[in-house]
UniProtKB/Swiss-Prot annotation:
Name of protein: Regulatory protein NPR5
Keyword Hydrolase: no
Gene from which this protein is expressed: NPR5
Binding site for Zn(2+): 125, 130, 132, 135
Upper lineage: Eukaryota, Viridiplantae, Streptophyta, Embryophyta, Tracheophyta
Native organism: Arabidopsis thaliana
Disrupted gene: phenotype observed: Defects in inflorescence and flower development. Bop1 and bop2 double mutant displays leafy petioles, loss of floral organ abscission, and asymmetric flowers subtended by a bract.
Entries under Pfam families matching the protein: Ank_2 (PF12796), BTB (PF00651), DUF3420 (PF11900)
Amino acid sequence: MSNLEESLRSLSLDFLNLLINGQAFSDVTFSVEGRLVHAHRCILAARSLFFRKFFCGTDSPQPVTGIDPTQHGSVPASPTRGSTAPAGIIPVNSVGYEVFLLLLQFLYSGQVSIVPQKHEPRPNCGERGCWHTHCSAAVDLALDTLAASRYFGVEQLALLTQKQLASMVEKASIEDVMKVLIASRKQDMHQLWTTCSHLVAKSGLPPEILAKHLPIDVVTKIEELRLKSSIARRSLMPHNHHHDLSVAQDLEDQKIRRMRRALDSSDVELVKLMVMGEGLNLDESLALHYAVESCSREVVKALLELGAADVNYPAGPAGKTPLHIAAEMVSPDMVAVLLDHHADPNVRTVGGITPLDILRTLTSDFLFKGAVPGLTHIEPNKLRLCLELVQSAAMVISREEGNNSNNQNNDNNTGIYPHMNEEHNSGSSGGSNNNLDSRLVYLNLGAGTGQMGPGRDQGDDHNSQREGMSRHHHHHQDPSTMYHHHHQHHF
């Protein structure tokens, strides 16, 4: 790193520390979602034309005067009815606390990370341990940041966010792509519009489905793109055959979407017909994983009884099986039906995590941390039952393997060694000790449920601002800690 780069980096961090430290030398305070954010007029005015005009237009903010970025003027908005902000504090409306801090972080330092904290529980992302690189939570945060940067006139941040969205939509769900498509149309972001419209055109969704999510003129343009693409493919057909792969992939995607709609409506018979008549591969289409996450126990049971799905099939880069997902959901019904159909409680993900590891970690979180954010939806009794089911299944498998090993040894050694009685076998194998340990865990979990208050008390606004900044300032985490540290960062 050159001396110039080092100097600029140091300058950026120095300014960012002013924001992180909150009240140090602060001369303006904002109220966002009931939380105070301390800042510095000179920095905001120097970095944003909006704030420059805002501060020039009001020498001393009145209690009911606020900033509303949905008002397109660059002066203080009209008084906010019902505002309860104390004198000297400027209420900010229509922008969330997290997005406002990201905006200020960029204004102070020129740098920002517009993604949620890795593995952080988010209300619009149901996957435990998600890295939030292209899920709905990541897309929504980027869209909110883009809107705020446009409203406050921070064009550099808007360009940075557009680039990030362009990379996100390549892997995002089609629903999220359509959200970005609508936003790019409203804000005249032509490159992002082009990227998203082509992705939607290739999705294979029929016009009647698109019309439920998109304006009719947008649907018309999508259909025009499809027509042009179809003509282009036909013109290349004598010379190219790679389009066959694309067509086959489109057909496979459509097949998977039909399968999921059938599962959503509990129509397992239709799925059976697709397997028999259309060659649908339930494993590659992750049918069982989807059913465990989104459907009822009866649907999962019926799907397993078709005999066409591998109950231990690993999915995605992490290699999670349906039992891993059921353990993360803390669903005794799903755990039980999967174990009934020979799901392996000892199967490991790519990171070496078993379903039992997941449940033990969740139990530990309850015992030692209390009801922390991300675990509040989990019922302790269900967690205890899931742990008991998976642990019992693991012990049964262990005993069967031990018996098979003993039988093999007995066949190989005809009477040379005396047989050990069952009591001695079970004691020496550690089975009773494991059972005792598991009972202690159950007792502790049950006893702890009465004390599961908040994980920590609310700090003051100064500490809250420091924590809010830290969530997006420290973003590196060891993937091996996916299950043991995913509840560290919360407000």
